Structure formats: C-alpha cells, structure tokens
Design a protein with these regions (language model features):
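PLP-dependent aminotransferase class I/II
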Residues: 10, 34-42, 46-50, 68-71, ...
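Structured binding elements
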Residues: 116
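Active-site phosphate-binding strand-loop segment of PLP-dependent enzymes
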Residues: 127-216, 221-223, 228
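Phosphate-binding glycine-rich loop
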Residues: 32-97, 111-113, 121-123, 146, ...
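N-terminal "arm"/small-domain region of PLP-dependent enzymes with the aminotransferase-like
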Residues: 1-30, 34, 375
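Conserved coil-to-alpha-helix start sites within the AMP-binding
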Residues: 104-109
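Hydrophobic/aromatic ligand-binding patch that stacks against planar heteroaromatic rings
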Residues: 110-112, 172, 261
C-alpha cells in the first residue's frame, strides 16, 4: 500500500513537549502564562529579522538584519480572531466599507461583516496573484465618489506565502490615509524588500492552524505597531474586562486568548521555523526545475529579487492549451494517494458575498480555473516532489498523445 502524500501536515520539532510539560508541571494551563509571553517574544524577535534568500539559494540558512518596524505581538486563538480584533481596534462599524483582496480564503473577509461593515472586493494582478494596486486606487476613488467617504481600511493578503506589491499598495494607502491590515496568515517568514510580511501595515495577522508554517494546534497572532495597541488588543481578547475588583464591562469583548499549553507548542515550533521555511523553498526549487521544460505548466515563483516567498504552498497554473484540466490532474493524483487542492475561489464569486461591491479584471477567476496547489509541507520529501512533477508532466503528455517536450 502506498504511503499518502499530503498537502501540508504539521511537523513537530521535538521541543514542543518540553514546553507543554513545563505548563503542566507548573499548572499554567490557562490562556496566559510563561509560554504565552515567551511565544509572543519569540515571534517579535523573528519578525525583526529579514531574509534575502532567492529561489536559487533556498536551502541556506536565514540571514538576519534589523526590521524597519518594531513589532508588538499578541497571541490569539486564531488568525480570524486576529483579523477581527484589527477591525475592532480600527473602530470599523456598521456603515463603513473595507476594501479586501478578492483572491483569498473567506477568513480575510468574514470579520468585516462581524462589525456590520461592507466588504469591497478588489481583484489581483498576475505577478504575485495578490491585490492589484491599479484596481485598489480605482476602487478607493469610486467608493469615495459613490458614498461620500473613503473606505475605513484595506485588507491585503500575502497569498500562499507570496508577498503583495507592498511598495505600490503602501503608497496608495498613505496618499488616502487609509490603514492597512496585512493578512500574513500564510506568509510567516516571507519578505518583501527585506522586510517581514505582516510588519508593513497598521496591523498584521498570522495564523498557526495545523497546516501553516508553524502550528499551535490552532491559533493566531495580531502584530501591533505599539505597546499600547497590543494592550488594547489584549483587553478586547479577554472579554473587555475593566480594571475593577469586580467584573465590569463598558465595551463588548471576546474570548480570543491563546492557551499557555498551545503557546508551548508554538515555542517549540519557533525552534524549527527556519528549517520549515528552507524546506518549503527547497521544494519550490525542485518543482521549478522539474517543470522548466514543460511549456504548459507554470510554477508560481518570486516575480523579482524584492520578493522572497516562504512557498507555504507551491502552486501551478495549467495552460488552456494543455488540453488537460486541473481537475483531471487533481483526480489522477488523488488516485495515487497524493493530495492537491484547487486555488481559492475568489470572494466576489462566492454566493455569500454576491451583493458586495467588487472591482475585477478577470485575473483571480482565471487563476481559480487554471490553478492547483501541490504538496509542500515538511513531510514532503524531495523524491515526493519529483514524483508529483513527473506524474503531472506524464498526464499532460498522455492527454496530448505525443511527446512535445
């Protein structure tokens, strides 16, 4: 029986059990404690580093330098809760509009609706697959003309680990004085122009779900610009309890804190994060070499040296001329017990958001129709990646009925 190859499974480095055991030994099993504090400090230290690695040097160690921002990290129960708290801290409410990247997972957009606000979706550009700066500016101008006020925030996503075009996006946001929320849930360790993703915007968001670059079993973090903002996030994450000897509440709060046990997993994971990033990037190099001679399969790679993706998920596009659809490839690989996944269905095409304003150019819809996510996690070996690439290439060849490579 063949061993299944999964998309992206969690990988334990060994230190996790030590931190968990310390939590049990000291009875710190609540959503605060030494592991929570330590995990936040570990993340903040990492986010002040930068990586200058390119695809061709993917197996080398991380290079470090001082980040442009000093991050203040608050560990939370999920990436979604972090996005929600960013909305709360920006005082987003009913009647407001928030611009959101359309090509993303639903969690990027859902918290906008939690606040009673309206998402306004902006399509992608083809280089990074992330928010189009041109459409972003068009959307801002059009919403101001139609509503008489500017959008309250901009949610930019670094999809599949690929950094967005932050220089252009930040210039637009600064010009209109609109805060940016960076959804870096998939981009821990990715950098743009040497700066860690998640540290450009007013707030950044990370996810530690079981399939992310590191996991806490389920968790997330909000990256804040100041100590005061972090304390405000913590206040709302702990039911907005006021500083009284009894329980008094003057604001609506939430139960969004991360447990000390889960944070212990995170601390152990931080010890192997550089290796995880290097492994994902090394797999990208293998896929790139394998598909280089295949004219109808394109691996999504860094557009230029300013971009350094962690390649959380390696993704490919199948040319319409290939006469072989992504679904056919996915089904063929599934028969070999190899897990793949379609690219995200854009939010402006989701039934739940059918009435939301959107500014589109067809890019994200084309990506959705032509793309596929390939196994990329720490348990995927170099030989696995070579096998997967070979199976895909052979499928395309067989469909054509000739050897055109």
């Amino acid at each position: 029986m063949k061993t299944p190859i999964y998309l992206c499974l969690a990988h334990m480095g060994g230190g996790e059990q030590r931190y968990i055991q310390e939590a049990f030994d000291t009875n710190w099993v609540v959503p605060l404690g030494p592991n929570v504090n330590g995990f936040e400090e570990d993340l903040a230290e990492f986010l002040q580093q930068s990586s200058t690695r390119s695809l061709s040097t993917a197996s080398t160690s991380l290079d470090s330098c001082t980040s442009k921002h000093t991050p203040h990290v608050c560990a939370l129960s999920s990436g979604t809760s972090a996005l929600h708290l960013a909305m709360v801290l920006l005082d987003i409410k009913a009647g407001d509009e928030v611009i959101c990247q359309s090509f993303t997972f639903a969690a990027s957009a859902n918290p906008i609706t939690y606040q009673g606000a309206t998402p306004v979706f902006v399509d992608s550009e083809p280089d990074t697959w992330n928010m189009s700066p041109q459409l972003l500016q068009e959307a801002i101008e059009d919403r101001m003309a139609k509503t008489g006020k500017k959008p309250k925030a901009i949610v930019v996503v670094h999809l599949y680990g690929m950094p967005a075009k932050m220089k252009e996006i930040m210039e637009i946001a600064t010009h209109y004085d609109i805060p940016i929320i960076e959804d870096a849930a998939e981009a821990l360790g990715s950098t743009y122009d040497g700066q860690q993703c998640g540290t450009f915007g007013h707030f950044g968001v990370l996810s530690f779900n079981g399939n992310k670059m590191i996991t806490t079993g389920g968790g997330g973090a909000i990256i804040c610009p100041t100590t005061e903002a972090k304390q405000r996030a913590l206040f709302f994450a702990t039911q907005a309890r006021e500083n009284y000897p009894y329980y008094q509440h003057e604001h609506i709060g939430y139960n969004y804190r991360l447990s000390n046990i889960s944070a212990g997993i995170g601390r152990g994971q931080m010890e192997v994060l550089p290796q995880h990033i290097a492994h994902h990037q090394h797999l990208a190099e293998i896929y790139a070499q394998a598909f280089a001679s295949c004219p109808h399969i394109t691996l999504h790679t860094n557009p230029n040296d300013a971009f350094s993706s962690n390649y959380w998920l390696n993704t490919i596009l199948i040319s319409p001329e290939a006469a072989c659809t992504p679904d056919e490839i996915r089904e063929m690989l599934a028969a070999q017990q190899i897990e793949t996944r379609p690219l995200w269905k854009p939010m402006h095409l989701q039934p739940v958001f059918r009435n939301a304003p959107s500014y589109t150019n067809g890019v994200s819809q084309s990506l959705f129709e032509r793309g596929l996510c390939l196994p990329s996690g720490p348990w995927v070996t170099a030989n696995d990646a070579k096998l997967i690439a070979d199976l895909i290439i052979q499928k395309v060849k067989k469909k054509y009925g000739c050897d055109f490579f």
